[in-house]
Each structure stands twice: as C-alpha cells, then as structure tokens.
C-alpha cells in the first residue's frame, strides 16, 4: 500500500446501505479535471456548493453538496473533493464510477488521460495518507479507527481524546525528557577528557526519576484505555443449575439465556456485550460443569472449559441454597465436594493473572445458617438483584479498572507493551547510573532503545509491515 500513495484515489466514504446522505471522496494531486467533469465548474475552496452532479452525457446523476479542500489544508494533506449526495447505494456507485470515468478521460492537450492512475482506495488509505503527510501521527490514526469501533460512550470519549492528540502529547513529553537525558549521557561519552561530570552536575539521576514518574502516569492512563478498547472477557462458570443463565440475564438486563429448573439446560455458550461504568464486558454463560450425561452435554462442557481458559475473569458461581443445613447431609457433602473439584481445576488450568471471583448465588433461598457459611467472594441473588452492584464493582476492581482523574485516553495493547519496554529500559538505566563506575555505553544504549519504543507509538519510527496491518483494518473510504 505504501508504494502507491502517490496515486489519486476515490471511494465511498459512508457506510454501506441506504441513508439520508452518502459521501464520495476523492484525494490526490491535480484533481481539478474530476471536479470540472462532475460539477461543471471550479469550486471555491472549503465552501459547500449545492449543484447537480452530471454523467459524461451531461445527464444529472443527483443533486447535492460539493466541497473542494485544496492541499495542504485537507484531511489527507492532498487536494480532496467530497461529493455529498443522497445515500442510496445505486446513486453512490454511479458517482464512484463517474469519478473513475472522469479521471480516465483524455486530456486533448496531450492525448492522454487526465488522471490515468485514479483508482478505488484501499481500506484506510485516506487516513494512511493523512499520516504520511504529517497531518496526524500513528496514535491519532489508530484512535480514529477506535472511535468508529467504540462500543461505549466512555470508550468513544477516550478515543476522541487520543484523536485530538492527548496521548501523542503525553508520549512526546516523555520523548523530550528522554532525549535531554540521552544528550547528557552522549556528551559524557563524546568528551571524556573534559574535567566536568556532566551526569552529576546535570542531576541525571533526578532527571531519570522524574521521567520514570511521568511514565508511570502515562502507563496508568494507557492501560485503562486498552481496557476500554479491548473490553474484558468474563465467563460465568459453575455446576448445573447454579443460576449462571439467570446471572447473565440479570447483568444484561434482558432475557438472553433460557432459565429452567432442569439441570443442564444450557448446552452451548451464550454471550452478551454489557457495560459497567462505560467499560465493555463480554459476558459468557457456559454449560454446567459436571460429568456429562450424553454426547451433546459433553461437547458443551468441553466448550465451557475452552471459554474459561480464555477468560480475563471467571465468575465461579455457587448455589448457596445447596449448602444449606436444612438439606440432607450427603447432598450437601456431594455438592461441596464437586465445587471443590472445580475450584482445584480452575486453579490448575488458569494463568495466575486470570481473576477468579467466588459468587454465592440464591441468597434469597438460603437460611440464615446457610448464609453464615459465606467466607469471601460476593453474595448475590440473581433473581432479586441483591448484591449485583457489589459484584459489578468487584469485577471492575479485579480487571484493574481505575479511571484516571484527568481522563483516560484510548490506547492499544501494542502501546501498553511499548510503554512496559520503556519502563524496563529505564529501570536498567537507573541501575547503571547508581553504579560506582557506570558503563556509559550501555546506559546510552538503554536510553536509545527506550526512545525507539516511544517513537514506535507515534509512528516516528515504525516498520512498514506494522503500518500496513494497522491501516488495513480501517473501512474503505476512511
């Protein structure tokens, strides 16, 4: 994609389907012939002009608004034409074809097409050109896609902050501090004969400590932003008839899963996207965990464990009424033993960073003696809603959600990984500075690697294959 960014491009910029308004966007160098062919005349810069859009025979395709954004004052940094027409698919396809036709028309002065290379844009190519022409950096470009894909209001507002440059400003502030510190180290390396200890005199250790403190704040906001973007996968697990489907319905506020008194009703997963304080959670209800009674249930249990093993958090649901002292002793013993087996399997199968929350359900059906058995976890009734707010807050706590007071900006996992690498490099640099005889060449290399990681976030230094992957995930027309 990068090799062809000089070609003029065109695409439908609005979502597929019918709508009140649809937009066709053209970007490139010297697109005046396309403007003249479709609009019949030149357009005043950055002014919306209502006029007919015509085909090659002069027939009206539609009437709408045309806006010309001359370079460099446009979204892509190139000459841009936007045709805002009625949002019917046929109309927009006719306008798209007309743009391509106008570009291929012969220029009588030279006997060749006006815009021989005018073509349909690749996914994300308009935004890619904005990045290549320094209209936005890479973090802002990613934020545009994240804003489009946002599943909650909080996520959308965070993406808007990143799109406006808040995240980039934070990264560039880190870069400025880091570069200044690196210059001190490089100066000490370049002028070893000078009778001046650059590092001590310039308080290099203090500068590094302040840089690390700033980095910690940025990492906190970026980590929260990654949670908003990626969402959290929460799996409800437990024995049959523990109330897993009822809990999913209660959290979602809708009857999504079938609820019956018959154990083993849920045979396959049921999932729903919900939000808690703007944090998107992908909640999955699974088949009850027990020795399967038939082949279908066996498959359901296997799928349940597959979902559990890929979860960020597991709600281990216990039927507290089954532990009630009023039940026959052997039934209670058997139920507790089965819960204990599941608990051991969860501990063995899941990574240490997977949160497991014990959820004690059916408090409304449990005697006071049974309620006294609860130790730890969250006590709820999926039927009455008791304890659900406590469970929601506990979920946010265990997944690490803690909104920064100055607001969260949207970030991606690659950004968080890069910041962690920077943190590690600065920690190594700190140990070098504290040594009796610092290895300045190693210290300089640590700082150089940290600078490179930060530069990858904004795209100042980014491999072409990563750029291709990022922009290919955009929709065509953006």
UniProtKB/Swiss-Prot annotation:
Residues 231-400 form the TrmE-type G domain. Homodimer. Heterotetramer of two MnmE and two MnmG subunits. Its EC number is 3.6.-.-. K(+) binds at residues 241, 260, 262, 265. (6S)-5-formyl-5,6,7,8-tetrahydrofolate binds at residues 25, 82, 135, 478. Binds 1 potassium ion per subunit. It is found in: Cytoplasm. GTP binds at residues 241-246, 260-266, 285-288. Belongs to the TRAFAC class TrmE-Era-EngA-EngB-Septin-like GTPase superfamily. TrmE GTPase family. This is tRNA modification GTPase MnmE. Exhibits a very high intrinsic GTPase hydrolysis rate. Involved in the addition of a carboxymethylaminomethyl (cmnm) group at the wobble position (U34) of certain tRNAs, forming tRNA-cmnm(5)s(2)U34. It comes from Polaromonas sp. (strain JS666 / ATCC BAA-500). Mg(2+) binds at residues 245, 266. GO terms for molecular function: GTP binding; GTPase activity; metal ion binding. One of its GO terms (cellular component) is cytosol. The keyword Nucleotidyltransferase does not apply. InterPro entries: G_TrmE, GTP-bd, GTP-bd_TrmE_N, GTPase_MnmE, MnmE_dom2, MnmE_helical, P-loop_NTPase, Small_GTP-bd. GO terms for biological process: tRNA methylation; tRNA wobble uridine modification. Keywords: Cytoplasm, GTP-binding, Hydrolase, Magnesium, Metal-binding, Nucleotide-binding, Potassium, tRNA processing. Its cofactor is K(+).
